[in-house]
Amino acid sequence: MTQDLSDKYYKQLIDLQDVELVEAQIRSLLDVPIESVSDLEKWLKDEKNLMIKIKEALTGHQVDFYRNTEDAEIKSTYLHDQQVIQPLLMKYEAKMNEKCCESPYFNQLDEKRYGLMRRVRESKVKLFREENIPLMVKEQELCTKYSEIMGGLTVDWDGEERPFPFIQSQLDHLDRTVREKAYHAMMSAHRQIKPDMDAIMDELVQLRHQIALNAGFENYRDYMFVAKNREYSVQDCYDFHENVEKHIIPAWNRLAEVFKSKLGVDTYRPWDNTAKLMKNPPYSEVSALMDGVSEMLGKTDPYFADRFDYMREHGLLDLGDRKGKSPGGFCTSLPVSGDTFVFANFSPSFFSLIALIHEMGHAVNGYLEFSEHGPIEDYQHRMEVAELYSHGMELLLLDKLDRFYPEEEDFKSAQREELRRAFTMLYGPLAGDLFQHWMYTNPKHTAKERDEKFFEISKRYGLNPVDTNGLEEEIGMSWAGTLHYFQVPFYNIEYSISMLGALQLLENYRKNPEQAVESFKKGASADYNQSIAAIYEETGVSFDFSEPAVKRMGEFLEKVIQDIH
């Protein structure tokens, strides 16, 4: 029986400090003879059982580090994983992929069950180059450095040192002077770390470009499309950018005029674009946040609340803000335990409430998948699917925001704010996607050119209706606050694609709430070996980001917002 080396929220069934043991267990798989289809299926099962043990330990160490970037022992464990274990895994993963793909029984595997796995393995064999391993290790080291810098970022606020998320939360404030003060404080903090951010990003762009060249690609963008096994093309992305600019941005401009009028301001500045019209914050203590979200989930479906309460009881939620904690929020799976963990570093605000609901969409999806199919492997976890259920959960709970905003006007404002967020998810991630297309197809760009391009794209999309006069430099450098550009490149457009699906789910919910919730659960527990389109269909929506689809959902969203007024 394997001993659990951890008393934490994750199971540590393999000692990653014992590198010889880890290597021996992986190598033993390579020595197994495969003489039939059933042998290959058993080999795949044994490989999965070993890999999920390793993955759970790696995930636990990573979450530990994000929870406390200043703990030397935790950091040492995490860096050992990045510098020693990950390179070992890359090397042996390539060997196992070759063994699998070269087997004469590989193409005899059942297409429905193994088709996606076959395509992913073939892509990985095509992409693998041993000379890229040290480059990828260096890439991870730079991402770790980014987390450390951002985790340690504090801002002086009224003579008190406050974590960066607290300052971000002040952008919600009803008082315009507070919002403007918070905006400039954030920009000042960005300016202080800008040289470090530029140095990290400059090196990341060059590393990633070299990784792509080594693998036989012209640029990192093209490499990543293969690495992500995308079910759409580069041209599809460019068309999506164009269609959103054509149909969503004009609607966003009209909506901005409404918000500007409600705020009673003559000019619509960046700190007005963040304002919330309801009383803030919606809670003061994390316990109150959890109590309220549990109720909202329970009113939507008892299973949703059951999973949330279970996570709360078992230490699978870390939601408060503190110094030394990595920025952002995420949900990650623990494949041996069959659990999910939600991490968030946000101060009390409307956004932190929505962020928790969003991550619980991921968590519910994870629990449903595990209960139906067991541990999901990385290749099955496509973000176009995952984000459908996180955005979908936000919109299924839209009519329950009165739990935090009991006064009618505040409740209406909160609903409008969530729908405004849906608008931002249609154009914001697309702007980030376009920015990265430019960065990685122009790898010799300078830091100054990068800032200028970011401002230009921001002005075309989210800041189109905003008066940015005199703030061009500050806005240009603000890309550095987005962890996706550093840690998960080209993980942007998935948010916008999935939001189109989530809006269809809301449309269905407004017609038949019970049926829409059942469709959510059906899709969230679907066989992930299917195509993205098939999983969307099981959820009762279409995987469609064509011009007619963008136009239709933009019109629907604008009408729903108008109906609330």
PLM features: residue spans?
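Auxiliary, metal-adjacent structural segments of Zn-dependent hydrolase domains
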Residues: 262, 272, 276-337, 349-350
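Post-HExxH zinc-binding segment in Zn-dependent metallohydrolases
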Residues: 242, 247, 380-410, 418-420, ...
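Inter-helical turn/loop segments and adjacent helix faces that build the functional surface
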Residues: 235, 258, 262, 300-303, ...
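Long, well-ordered alpha-helical segments
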Residues: 201-212, 217-218, 222, 255-259, ...
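C-terminal, non-catalytic "cap/extension" segments appended to globular domains
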Residues: 271, 356, 364, 400-403, ...
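Active-site recognition of the HExxH zinc-binding catalytic motif
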Residues: 344-370, 387-390, 395, 435, ...
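Glycine- and acidic
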Residues: 127-128, 185-193, 230-238, 272-281, ...
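A well-structured
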Residues: 1-279
